[in-house]
């Protein structure tokens, strides 16, 4: 068992428990959705494992960091939905560019000028809704850039 502290109160969990479980326990105390944990003053994603003895607070979609995390998740959801619904042939070499925020939204476009028709947009929207309902975790991994250069360059 490990102990984590929220508002000075200890909570005990099994060794392999994620912050998400603690967030779910405490969510009724929050008006808005919990999207990040602050662990000993450092931001952590909810899918990370609880550290024994840590002091935890939570950020919701009402905080600046929470809004940024939420937007990043929505962009990743959009990218997955595009990959699932629009053929490789149709996408070609187009990449999605997220340029800036508009009010509470984001301005996104394809860098090579691809324009989706109304039916394709509906398919992407439906795919995003299905993915959201499936509630898949979004996990961030850091990969050393030296791993990118293990193969000889085509110019060699």
Pin down the residues of each PLM region:
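Conserved small/polar residues in nucleotide/adenosyl-binding loops
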Residues: 149-156
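Generic structural motif
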Residues: 37, 138-140
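Conserved glycine-bearing catalytic or ligand-binding loops at nucleotide- and phosphate-handling centers
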Residues: 122-138
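Extended, well-ordered alpha-helical scaffold/bundle regions in very large, multi-domain proteins
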Residues: 114-124
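A glycine-rich phosphate-binding loop feature that marks nucleotide/adenosyl-phosphate handling sites
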Residues: 100-104, 142-148
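Short His/Asp/Glu-rich catalytic/ion-coordination signatures at enzyme active sites or charged loops
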Residues: 103-116
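Short acidic, glycine/serine/threonine-rich loops at helix termini
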Residues: 49, 70, 120-121, 151
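Ubiquitin-like/PB1-type beta-grasp interaction modules and other compact soluble beta-rich domains
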Residues: 1-75, 80, 87, 91-105, ...
């Amino acid at each position: 068992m490990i102990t984590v502290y929220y508002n000075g109160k200890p909570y005990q969990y099994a060794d392999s428990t994620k912050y998400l479980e603690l967030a779910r326990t405490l969510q009724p105390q929050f008006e808005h959705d919990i999207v990040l944990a602050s662990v000993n003053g450092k931001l952590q994603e909810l899918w990370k494992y609880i550290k024994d003895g840590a002091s935890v607070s939570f950020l919701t979609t009402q905080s600046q960091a929470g809004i940024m995390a939420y937007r990043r998740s929505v962009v990743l959801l959009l990218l997955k939905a595009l990959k699932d619904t629009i053929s490789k042939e149709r996408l070609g070499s187009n990449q999605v560019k997220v340029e800036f925020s508009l009010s509470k939204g984001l301005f996104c476009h394809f860098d090579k000028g691809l324009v989706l028709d109304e039916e394709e947009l509906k398919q992407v929207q439906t795919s995003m809704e299905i993915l959201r309902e499936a509630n898949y975790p979004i996990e961030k991994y850091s990969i050393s850039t030296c791993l990118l250069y293990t193969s000889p360059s085509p110019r060699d």
